[in-house]
């Protein structure tokens, strides 16, 4: 039996990854992390979506220690969420230092316990916004280190790594989940489900991608299939 663990926040990217994983694996587990994030609604959203999409199990892990160590606008009400991210010269204040290091490591430990062959994460380098832990070289390096440390061959899969946001919408549509991803996921930095607040960086990226996909469906779908190898 093929098993996978999805690092699952209930946002657009991880929900799209879960939708795909349900078609590619016999059994899919979801892991969501409570790190004292500013908008706790995402945990409830993740729980509902994991159930709706048929995850075998959904585990919420308490990693609130990260909140004490990592100062970010996503963990501190006193730090305002910017409408737009800074350019590639700087790291945005929405970056939570060490988050993906911790999440992927703990997801791999969970994968070890449930005998899963893969950990799936929705990080993406194409829409890189200054987050160093979304880079392909980081994921591969951590994957290598984790496998050495556990003497186990667990793959870190990044289905969205080389596709842009419009193509991510196309991927959700390919798996028949465009409406669910649009209406029921929570990507907004201000904690508003669906289309979100409409002005934070996450909402801008999401909306621009959706508009581009809806205006160029055939071309974007073709590009997505070419990049992902789907037919």
Curated annotation (Swiss-Prot):
ATP binds at residues 8-18. Binds 1 zinc ion per subunit. Its cofactor is Zn(2+). Pathway: Purine metabolism; 7-cyano-7-deazaguanine biosynthesis. Zn(2+) binds at residues 188, 197, 200, 203. Keywords: ATP-binding, Ligase, Metal-binding, Nucleotide-binding, Queuosine biosynthesis, Zinc. GO terms for biological process: queuosine biosynthetic process. The keyword Magnesium does not apply. Its EC number is 6.3.4.20. It is an enzyme of class 6 (ligase). GO terms for molecular function: ATP binding; ligase activity, forming carbon-nitrogen bonds; zinc ion binding. It catalyses: 7-carboxy-7-deazaguanine + NH4(+) + ATP = 7-cyano-7-deazaguanine + ADP + phosphate + H2O + H(+). It comes from the Bacteria. Signal peptide: none annotated. Belongs to the QueC family. Catalyzes the ATP-dependent conversion of 7-carboxy-7-deazaguanine (CDG) to 7-cyano-7-deazaguanine (preQ(0)). NCBIfam families: 7-cyano-7-deazaguanine synthase QueC, PRK11106.1. This is 7-cyano-7-deazaguanine synthase. It comes from Salmonella paratyphi B (strain ATCC BAA-1250 / SPB7). The gene is queC.
């Amino acid at each position: 039996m093929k098993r996978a663990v999805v690092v699952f926040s209930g946002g657009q990217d991880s929900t799209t990854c879960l939708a795909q994983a349900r078609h590619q694996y016999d059994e899919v587990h979801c892991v969501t992390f409570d790190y004292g994030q500013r908008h706790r609604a995402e945990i409830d959203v993740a729980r509902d979506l994991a159930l709706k999409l048929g995850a075998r199990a959904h585990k919420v892990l308490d990693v609130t220690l990260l909140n004490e160590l990592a100062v970010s606008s996503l963990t501190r009400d006193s730090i305002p969420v910017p409408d737009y991210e800074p350019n590639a010269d700087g790291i945005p204040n929405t970056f939570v230092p060490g988050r993906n290091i911790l999440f992927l490591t703990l997801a791999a430990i969970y994968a070890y316990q449930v005998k899963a062959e893969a950990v799936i994460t929705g990080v993406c380098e194409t829409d890189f916004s200054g987050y160093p832990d979304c880079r392909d070289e980081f994921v591969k390096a951590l994957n290598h280190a984790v496998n050495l440390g556990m003497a186990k061959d667990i793959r870190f899969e990044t289905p969205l790594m080389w596709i842009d946001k419009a193509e991510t919408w196309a991927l959700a549509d390919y798996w028949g989940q465009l409406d669910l991803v649009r209406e029921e996921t929570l990507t907004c930095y201000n904690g508003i489900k669906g289309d979100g607040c409409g002005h934070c960086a996450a909402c801008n990226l999401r909306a621009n991608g959706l508009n581009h996909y809806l205006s160029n469906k055939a071309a974007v779908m073709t590009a997505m299939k070419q990049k992902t190898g789907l037919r």
